[in-house]
Swiss-Prot record:
EC category: ligase
Cofactor note: Binds 2 magnesium or manganese ions per subunit.
Residues that bind Mg(2+) 1: D298, E311
Protein name per UniProt: D-alanine--D-alanine ligase
Keywords, alphabetical: ATP-binding, Cell shape, Cell wall biogenesis/degradation, Cytoplasm, Ligase, Magnesium, Manganese, Metal-binding, Nucleotide-binding, Peptidoglycan synthesis
């Protein structure tokens, strides 16, 4: 049986969403194939494990949860396996299944640690996770590859001045959408119609991230699809999100009906040509950002039927199982595929050369 470390939580404003995704995995994973070891990272960075983490109800009382959990005191690795030390107990992990959302988990930070420790993990690699987490880097790469994105500008807290507000008006025109550059779940996102609203929205976005992207707002439909694979890529069915406002916000996604997927129309009511175009752009996006694993790509469809890549999620909420279900995959099969891809990518990584058989300090230097 394969020991799977299910990592979730972490220091992120999307912390609770990560917990939900992890427990969806716990509900549907094939326990005849995998021994699931939950590893919860608290908001202040503690690493916890234990059976108590397997019941979502226990997360209502975090103080009790921490007391009843086993704190991981140290982490090491040997022979491609992650080793966790908790009191006197040692836990060995064969592969890590990542269900983080947002900063300090989905952004390449945990992936970088696992790369350094030489341990297989699900989802995109370190660099790809970093690219896709940053909306600015994502759009710059896609633009370079001639993949359609809406017009945008960006700034950071260090260099931000009033001139940026004027530049936005000249280049983008109102209305615009303001977003923290490295955040998901529509947190901190605002539509603005004038300079005063723009300035206020940028300040709000800066409270979540020190980098902000401002995009031209277009009246559009929101379409999504998932892409999964490594060397062979498969694209899921396409969905349409029926939004109640100008964009599908955090409240709709997780607090109101959005959490029950009542706003999701699968398959999306679009013609076959448009469907094929979106799937083709999805494949190109997956490759341009050097992704592997299971991602979700969000699109905008304008009134004149132009398609734009809006955002890329390297660890989508609920692992986009609802999209894969409509494409003939069970949630359990999605998890199987993600773990298989993790091992395949790890095998390729092991073939790389990381050192040269030369001792520079032992070389004789002619005088």
């Amino acid at each position: 049986m394969i020991n799977v470390g299910l990592l979730f939580g972490s220091k992120s404003v999307e912390h609770e969403i990560s917990i939900i995704t992890a427990h969806q995995v716990l509900s549907f994973v094939d326990k005849n194939k995998y021994n699931i070891i939950p590893i919860y990272i608290t908001k202040d960075g503690k690493w916890l494990t234990g059976k108590i983490l397997e019941d979502l109800e226990n997360f209502k009382n975090l103080e009790r949860l921490e007391k009843k959990s086993k704190q991981i005191s140290s982490i090491s690795a040997k022979d491609g396996k992650l080793i966790l030390h908790s009191n006197i107990k040692k836990i060995t992990i064969d592969v890590c299944l990542l269900t983080f959302h947002g900063s300090n988990g989905e952004d390449g930070s945990i992936q970088g640690m696992l790369e350094f420790l030489n341990v297989p993990y699900t989802g995109c690699g370190m660099y790809s996770s970093m690219y896709t987490m940053d909306k600015v880097i994502t759009k710059l790469i896609l633009k370079e590859k001639n993949i359609p994105v809406v017009d945008f500008l960006y700034t950071n807290k260090k260099n931000y001045t009033n001139d940026f507000l004027n530049h936005c008006k000249e280049v983008l025109e109102y209305p615009m959408i303001v977003k923290p550059a490295r955040l998901g779940s529509s947190i901190g996102v605002k539509k603005v119609n004038d300079k005063c609203e723009l300035e206020e929205a940028i300040e709000t976005a800066f409270s979540f991230d020190d980098k902000v992207i401002v995009e031209k707002w277009i009246d559009s439909r929101e379409l999504n699809c998932a892409v999964m694979g490594y060397k062979n890529i498969v694209v899921s069915e396409i969905e349409e999100i029926k939004k109640q406002k100008d964009f599908f916000d955090y409240n709709e996604k997780y607090v109101q009906k959005g959490k029950k997927f009542s706003n999701h129309i699968i398959p999306a009511p679009i013609d076959e040509n448009l469907k094929n175009t979106i799937k083709s752009i999805a494949r190109d996006t997956f490759n341009a950002l050097e992704c592997h694993g299971n991602i979700r790509i969000d699109f905008l469809l304008s009134k004149d039927n132009k398609i734009y890549v809006n955002e890329v999620n390297s660890i989508p909420g609920a692992l986009s199982y609802y999209l894969w279900q409509m494409s003939g995959f069970t949630f359990s099969q999605v998890i199987d595929n993600m773990i298989s891809i993790a091992f395949e990518a790890f095998k390729d990584k092991k073939s790389k050369i990381y050192s040269i058989d030369t001792n520079l300090f032992d070389l004789k230097v002619e005088k």
